[in-house]
């Protein structure tokens, strides 16, 4: 079986990055929730 985690920084940013989160309504909700919780890092 192939490993399930194949690190790829470009994909990582595209999927979980700040701009990707800001692009959708639900993504903005995620950021808001993480701000409320007081997360040190909002995104990867």
UniProtKB/Swiss-Prot annotation:
Q: Name one GO biological process term.
A: translation
Q: Name one Pfam family in it.
A: Ribosomal_L34
Question: What's any one GO cellular component for it?
Answer: ribonucleoprotein complex
- Protein keywords: Ribonucleoprotein, Ribosomal protein
Molecular function per GO:
structural constituent of ribosome
Matches recorded under Gene3D superfamilies: 1.10.287.3980
Q: Where are the transmembrane segments?
A: none
The text of the family note is:
Belongs to the bacterial ribosomal protein bL34 family.
Name this polypeptide is given: Large ribosomal subunit protein bL34
What is the gene called?
rpmH
């Amino acid at each position: 079986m192939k490993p399930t985690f194949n690190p790829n920084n470009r994909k990582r940013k595209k999927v979980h990055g700040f701009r990707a989160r800001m692009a959708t309504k639900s993504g903005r909700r995620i950021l808001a929730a993480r701000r409320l919780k007081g997360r040190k890092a909002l995104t990867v």
